[in-house]
């Protein structure tokens, strides 16, 4: 797992004025909140928030977004409360985390195109701050990068959600590189044989 020192080094490369003490505090807070939790891959759970933060650091996002990434699952998956987050990190970060949590709690009722479109609109409407969507997209991207650790039925369900909801959202926000990776990762699950066939054809050209 990437250390806080390495994260700070990366942030300093584009934002030397960030409050690095608070970023370190959010890292340690998230680590302790998720202590004893593991991902399906067997990795400690906090690896996931750190990887989400790294995706957003690569996009050179502000420190509040990075802190939100490190804390984004604390309300949903630990005993920490929104009030505790606000007391520790202020209203801006706590509201961002709350926004990500609310999006996570939304469930897709249908994968038909018209319903998927309504769901995307609901995502946009609920996200008063675009940074909430950015954290959610980074969250989904890392989950898709590690999807092979899940049972196949969950892989298929999440890949369909990603193809119908998250990849188009990334495109609408101008994140074409993220849209393309989300689509590719979904396609690998949903149509792996067809994808391999296409790759083989290109290789033989």
Residue ranges and their predicted role:
Residues 1-205:
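Active-site helical microenvironments for divalent-metal-assisted chemistry
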